[in-house]
Regions:
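Collagenous Gly-X-Y triple-helix signature in extracellular proteins
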Residues: 1-175
Length: 175
């Protein structure tokens, strides 16, 4: 089964994806790639330009509710305080090559990746992609805040992230 129709696939841009080393543990990020669909890095998940909090600590902007489909595929969801929130993968390596950084149920960026391994299907995938906005396939849906309120759409093209944390920067604790 395909996630996208042929016309939708043609309306997705290829993206040069930089696979930098983990900014806290210097674990090699591997080769850069050109991809149509990918997952965010630590730097991207902590980028205010993308709407996220700069700190790697708890953040509402990184919380993500699992869909029924994700749960049926094995993704674990919090059943208590953060109801239906789940962990999601980042592409940055963790403290060593066997771990991958991830975001936990309360939006904390877990840069070590400890506690989950590469084959752990309890962690969900939250894909990122770039759309050709000139395509007639896509329609702007507006914005919806975390409280469910819709706002008047403001189309603003995104630019390359201008924030790249280094191990020397103080941007919060690392777990």
């Amino acid at each position: 089964k395909n996630a996208f129709s042929l016309s939708e696939k043609n309306a997705i841009k290829s993206t040069n994806v930089e696979n930098k080393s983990n900014p806290y543990y210097n674990t090699d990020g591997g080769n850069n790639t050109v991809d149509s669909v990918y997952v965010l890095s630590i730097e991207e998940a902590c980028n205010v330009t993308f709407g996220f909090e700069k700190e790697i600590s708890e953040s509402k902007t990184r919380e993500s509710k699992n869909t029924d489909y994700a749960e049926n595929c094995g993704a674990a969801s919090d059943e208590e305080e953060y109801e239906k929130n789940g962990w999601w993968w980042l592409r940055s390596p963790g403290i060593n090559p066997w771990f991958v950084a991830e975001i936990n149920t309360y939006g904390w960026c877990c840069a070590t990746g400890e506690g989950t391994s590469l084959d752990d299907n309890a962690v969900a995938v939250r894909p990122a992609l770039h759309l050709k906005l000139s395509s007639s396939v896509w329609k702007y849906a507006g914005k919806v805040g975390s409280n469910g309120d819709a706002s008047i759409p403001t189309v603003k093209p995104t630019s390359k992230p201008d924030f790249e944390p280094t191990p020397d920067e103080s941007i919060g604790g690392v777990i």
